[in-house]
Amino acid sequence: MSSWLIYALLSAVCAALVAIFGKIGLQNLDANTATAIRAVIMALFLVGVVVAQGKLALVGEVVANKKAMLFIVLSGVAGALSWLFYFVALKNGNVAQVAPIDKLSVVFAVVLAVILLGEKISLMAGAGVALISVGALLVALG
């Protein structure tokens, strides 16, 4: 099995746990405050990973790359907005409805990759994107 597939599957399992743990943790709490606390925990955890890997010295290299930093900042803002919207949706909706709609990000990512990055997708991949769209809506609305 390819390493990218293993990491993608691990990511999917962890994302599922985010939905379950988030829904349980949000009971009677403000979603935005909980999201901010989650972000701090994630930041501390990730800094710990970088330190444990001995890569703290690479931070300066990343920060010095202006173009990379612009897109890392934009990615961070988009990610923060995604988390805020996701936790508000989880607080107010059912995991079985919110999680599939959230996964429409796959569809949006593919469409944006084609439009903005010039990536090419096969007819089979296009059919898969359509099936993901329909499947997410069927699960969420069914």
What are these regions (language model features)?
Residues 1-13, 29, 43-72, 83-92, ...:
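Membrane-interface interhelical linkers
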Residues 6, 10-13, 37-41, 70, ...:
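Hydrophobic residues within alpha-helical transmembrane segments
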Residues 12, 16, 20, 47, ...:
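Hydrophobic/small/kink-forming positions within alpha-helical transmembrane segments
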Residues 17-42, 97:
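Juxtamembrane helix-loop-helix junctions in multi-pass membrane proteins
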Residues 25, 34, 89, 115-117:
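Hydrophobic/aromatic residues within transmembrane alpha-helices
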Residues 46, 124-141:
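Hydrophobic transmembrane alpha-helices of multi-pass small-molecule transport proteins
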Residues 53-54, 117-118, 142:
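Short helix-capping/hinge motifs at transmembrane helix termini and TM-loop junctions
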Residues 106-125:
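C-terminal transmembrane-helix exit sites in multi-pass transporters
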